[in-house]
């Protein structure tokens, strides 16, 4: 791990990237739709050609540049997995684990022959319950092997003391994406609930229950999940960290919710010596105690049976997996067919043994020069953000000083971790069923989680994504930004591209993650990662006033007839998109001011910067997925990450000659002006 500090002198450009005759534009003109005017629909103008050339296939609810790169990575990972599977490796070796797990998922003949037999012991454990007092201990036993329950628990950073881990208890127990799916009464949502009820009935029947039994159990499940959802915080409410922070002593927890046997629950989970914890969502957990007290034992059993059925739905027969896809894939997202089995198998291996694949992936596909280039880019972006902070006339010197301190202590992680996860204690046994191996892997993960975190300080070297992941993140409690190797490829990053391309793509990604440290959530954490106020009262008021502009703007965007974007839900990501563009353009200007880039293919460097940014968000999406994402995703839809964000960037207007006559025009006084 390396800490990168802002230099006192302005960083220069990226060496060869500003050598005119060596580096390339990398803007693919075929991606454009020049029949569209930039000021009318910039998303279509910049990406319409790509959309036309990449229509949605039946396996996708949405497909964009992120997905295209993930497909490329998939092919690379597939080759690595097949190499491991082809080796005659010793039992217990990493190669054996990778190869046998992949082969188990691929072996549909065996899984179909086994039917539901692999999970019958779990179902029998649930059915054998005689007293309500057995529910919580059973839930703990199930939880440690990957079967969900009425709520969730885990060990994570204490936001008030970022060096310490603490136990947390969180809302959970529902199988629809958000609480609104249980309560909204528009026709589309009511139809989704009806389809969900059908799905539950069909799944119980596939596990051997009669139609009458399945229908009765479905009603019990829906009643309990609806009660749980009603007490959940919404995603918007959860964006306020303090809404999910209620620290108390263990004795206070027992007094607050006496209807749950906490000693037995945590003893089974291997967590002992609890002194204090965070009851993140008290109303939801109180409702669990009320449900156990008020509902008939038969209903509680039906609910726990459902948790087994749902949690194992992709581990058994093709018929059960297809039934699950029909609801979650088709009804909720609009997909027509499942992905090929090899992709599903690869995703299982990648999700369960990610660091094994990550180490192989980095060795073969991530050149050291890419890490060096990214390190320089990050330094340049940090300098630019410092300049942007200084340029904010609305902010006091006191708050600016604290902002610089936070920026100067960013931890930057690029490419891959310095240490890899150890899987030596995990057994993948091909003599057992795939479902039984899933239980083993889940228990391994839980025991590893407890061993590494309970009673231990926060590991600031920990990575929260594998190197092959096509994404990036900012973690406020460690004040770190992370860019895995997987995203450091075209169309985000290209070693042979000029600065206009790289600053417009990966530069904005870097700036986006940096801005998260100063968005409506991140600004509430200090340089050490603690939830602490470092703003003057007046500056905080001005920040909230300014960001309300973008909330109101996105609230007015109609993403489907009768469905608007949620400006509050997406506020943090929208601020980060805006900040990423502002910071990266500043860094781009710094890098090229002494060595300006030429016009290429009729586009100025500034135009290529914004085309490169927009190209990252090229994609197509189904209406069902638009509805699902609008209700549940903190990110704006790709179209609006272009058409909703660029109209708030003054330099974009200059680059493309946008005027008040253009539909995307936003008066300057109504534009977001922050960072």
Where is each model-derived feature located?
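C-terminal motif of bacterial Sec signal peptides marking the signal peptidase cleavage site
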Residues: 15-16
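Active-site-surrounding "flap" and adjacent substrate/cofactor-binding loops of secreted or lumenal enzymes
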Residues: 34-40, 45-110
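Short, solvent-exposed loop/turn elements at domain surfaces
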Residues: 50-54, 176-177, 491
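Intrinsically disordered, low-complexity linker/terminal regions across diverse proteins
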Residues: 70, 221, 256-259, 278-282, ...
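Noncatalytic, helix-rich "gating/capping" subdomain that lines the substrate-entry/channel surface
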Residues: 84-376, 380
């Amino acid at each position: 791990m390396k800490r990168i500090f802002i230099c006192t002198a302005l960083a220069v450009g990226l060496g060869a990237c500003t050598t005119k005759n060596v580096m390339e534009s990398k803007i693919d003109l075929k991606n454009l739709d020049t029949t569209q005017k930039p000021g009318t629909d910039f998303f279509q103008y910049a990406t319409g050609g790509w959309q036309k050339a990449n229509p949605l296939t039946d396996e996708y609810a949405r497909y964009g540049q992120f997905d295209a790169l993930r497909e490329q990575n998939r092919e690379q990972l597939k080759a690595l997995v097949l190499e491991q599977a082809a080796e005659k490796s010793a039992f217990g070796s990493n190669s054996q684990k990778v190869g046998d797990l992949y082969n188990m998922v691929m072996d549909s003949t065996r899984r179909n022959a086994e039917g539901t037999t692999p999970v019958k012991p779990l179902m029998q454990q649930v059915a054998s319950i005689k007293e309500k007092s057995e529910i919580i201990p059973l839930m703990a036993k199930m939880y440690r092997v990957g079967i969900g329950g009425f709520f969730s628990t885990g060990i994570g950073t204490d936001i008030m003391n970022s060096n310490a881990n603490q136990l947390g208890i969180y809302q959970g127990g529902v199988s629809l994406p958000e609480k609104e799916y249980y309560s909204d009464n528009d026709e589309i949502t009511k139809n989704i609930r009806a389809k969900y009820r059908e799905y539950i009935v069909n799944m119980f029947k596939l596990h051997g229950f009669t139609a009458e039994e399945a229908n009765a159990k479905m009603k019990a499940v829906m009643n309990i999940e609806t009660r749980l959802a009603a007490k959940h915080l919404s995603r918007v409410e959860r964006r306020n960290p303090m809404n999910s922070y209620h620290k108390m002593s263990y004795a206070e927890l027992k007094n607050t919710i006496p209807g749950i046997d906490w000693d037995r629950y945590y003893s089974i989970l291997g967590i002992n010596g609890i002194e204090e914890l965070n009851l993140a969502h008290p109303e939801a957990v109180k409702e669990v105690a009320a449900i156990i007290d008020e509902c008939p034992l038969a209903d509680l059993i039906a609910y726990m049976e459902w948790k087994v059925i749902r949690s194992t739905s992709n581990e058994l027969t093709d018929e059960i997996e297809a039934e699950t896809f029909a609801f979650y894939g088709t009804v909720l997202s609009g997909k027509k067919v499942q992905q090929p089995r090899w992709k599903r198998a690869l995703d299982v291996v990648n999700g369960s043994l990610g660091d094994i694949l990550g180490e192989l992936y980095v060795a073969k596909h991530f050149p050291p020069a890419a890490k060096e280039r990214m390190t320089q880019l990050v330094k340049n972006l940090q300098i630019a953000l410092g300049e942007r902070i200084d340029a904010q006339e609305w902010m006091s010197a006191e708050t600016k000083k604290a902002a610089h301190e936070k920026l100067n202590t960013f931890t930057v992680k690029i490419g891959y971790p310095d240490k890899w996860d150890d899987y030596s204690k995990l057994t993948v046994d091909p003599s057992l069923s795939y479902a039984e191996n899933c239980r083993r892997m889940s228990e391994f993960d839980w025991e590893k989680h407890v061993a590494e975190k309970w009673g231990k300080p926060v590991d600031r070297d920990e990575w929260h994504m594998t190197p092959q992941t096509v994404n990036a993140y900012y973690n406020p409690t460690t004040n770190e930004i992370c860019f895995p190797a997987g995203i450091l490829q075209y169309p985000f990053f290209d070693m042979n591209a000029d600065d206009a391309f790289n600053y417009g793509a990966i530069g904005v990604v870097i700036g986006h993650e940096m801005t998260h440290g100063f968005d409506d959530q991140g600004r509430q954490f200090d340089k050490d990662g603690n939830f602490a106020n470092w703003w003057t009262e007046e500056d905080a008021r001005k920040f909230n006033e300014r960001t309300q502009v973008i909330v109101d703007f996105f609230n007015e965007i109609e993403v489907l007839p009768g469905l608007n974007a949620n400006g509050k839900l997406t506020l943090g990501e929208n601020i980060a998109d805006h900040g990423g563009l502002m910071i990266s353009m500043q860094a781009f200007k710094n890098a090229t001011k002494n060595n300006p880039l030429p016009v290429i293919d009729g586009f100025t460097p500034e135009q290529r910067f914004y085309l490169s940014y927009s190209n990252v968000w090229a994609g197509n999406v189904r209406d069902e997925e638009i509805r699902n994402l609008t209700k549940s995703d903190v990110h704006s839809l790709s179209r609006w990450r272009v058409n909703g964000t660029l109209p708030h960037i003054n330099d974009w207007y200059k680059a493309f000659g946008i005027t008040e006559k253009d539909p995307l025009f936003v008066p300057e006084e109504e534009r977001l002006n922050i960072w």
